C-alpha cells in the first residue's frame, strides 16, 4: 500500500566516529584522530556561523586558531620569504572560508590586520608578522575553554561545514610540518565529496527532522520507545542505494537498536 510508505532518512550526525571512518574508507588507524578533529572543528564552525549569542565566543576561537597556525608557520619556516608565502596562503584560504559561509566583518578585519603585516622587502619581513601576532586581541582562556568543548554523539551539526573543517585541520597539520597530510587523507576527502554531492547520500544529508538524539530518532522512525509496547514490522527499501551505503545504513541502525536495548532494564 503506497499510503503506508514514508521517505527514509538516516541523519549523518547520528553516525559515531567509527561509522564515519568506515564510510570514508579510512585504512589507517592514525586517520582516526584526523577525522575526530574534523568533526570537532565542524561543530565549532557551525556554532560560529549560526548567529546565536555564543558567536563571539566561537569567533574568538577562530581567531585563536588562525593565530596558532600562523605561529607554527613562523616557527618552522627557514626564511622570511617562505614564512610570508605560507602565511598569505593561509589568510587567502581563511578569507575564502568566511566569504563562503558568512560575511563576518569582525573576522574580515582581523585577517586584513594580519595581512597588512605580511610585507617583505629584499626577502626580509623585519619581524612585522611576529609582532602583529603577539599584539592580537584574543581571549586565550576563553579560546582554550572553547577548544576543550567536545561534539557529543548525536549532537546536531551542519554537514555544510565539513569541508571547511577539513581545510582548517589540513592547514594546521601543514603548518606543523606534516607536508604529506593531503596525500595521507586523499581517499577520505574523496569519499567526503561523495557524501556531500552524490544523490545516493541525500537520505543522510537532508533529513526532514532534526532529532535530539538516537532515542528520538528510533521512536519517530521505528516506533521504538519506552511508551510503545507494540512491535511494528518496518521494511526499508534499499534497492536504490549502493552496497557501501547499504552496509553503512545496516550497521548504524543495528548499532543504535543494540545500544537502546542495552540501556533497558529487566524485561524491557
Regions found by a protein language model. Give the residues of each.
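P-loop NTPase motor domains
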Residues: 5-268
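AAA+/P-loop NTPase substrate/partner-engagement loops
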Residues: 1-3
Amino acid at each position: 500500500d503506497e499510503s503506508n510508505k514514508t521517505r527514509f532518512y538516516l541523519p549523518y550526525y547520528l553516525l559515531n566516529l567509527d561509522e564515519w571512518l568506515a564510510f570514508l574508507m579510512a585504512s589507517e588507524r592514525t586517520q582516526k584522530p584526523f577525522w575526530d578533529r574534523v568533526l570537532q572543528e565542524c561543530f565549532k564552525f557551525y556554532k560560529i556561523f549560526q548567529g546565536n549569542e555564543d558567536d563571539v565566543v566561537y569567533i574568538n576561537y577562530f581567531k585563536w586558531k588562525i593565530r596558532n597556525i600562523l605561529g607554527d608557520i613562523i616557527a618552522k619556516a627557514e626564511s622570511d620569504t617562505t614564512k610570508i608565502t605560507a602565511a598569505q596562503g593561509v589568510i587567502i584560504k581563511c578569507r575564502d572560508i568566511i566569504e563562503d559561509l558568512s560575511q563576518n566583518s569582525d573576522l574580515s578585519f582581523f585577517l586584513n590586520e594580519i595581512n597588512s603585516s605580511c610585507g617583505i622587502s629584499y626577502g626580509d619581513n623585519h619581524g612585522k608578522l611576529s609582532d602583529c601576532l603577539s599584539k592580537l586581541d584574543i581571549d586565550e582562556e576563553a579560546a582554550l575553554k572553547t577548544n576543550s568543548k567536545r561534539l557529543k554523539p548525536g549532537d546536531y551539526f551542519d554537514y555544510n561545514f565539513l569541508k571547511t573543517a577539513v581545510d582548517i585541520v589540513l592547514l594546521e597539520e601543514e603548518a606543523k610540518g606534516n607536508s604529506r597530510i593531503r596525500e595521507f587523507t586523499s581517499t577520505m576527502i574523496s569519499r567526503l565529496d561523495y557524501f556531500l554531492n552524490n544523490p545516493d547520500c541525500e537520505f543522510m544529508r537532508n533529513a526532514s527532522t532534526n532529532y535530539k538524539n538516537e532515542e528520538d530518532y528510533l521512536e519517530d522512525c521505528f516506533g521504538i520507545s519506552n511508551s510503545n509496547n507494540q512491535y511494528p514490522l518496518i521494511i526499508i527499501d534499499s534497492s536504490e542505494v549502493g552496497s557501501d551505503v547499504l552496509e553503512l545504513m545496516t550497521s548504524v541502525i543495528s548499532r543504535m537498536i543494540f545500544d537502546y536495548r542495552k540501556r533497558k532494564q529487566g524485561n524491557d
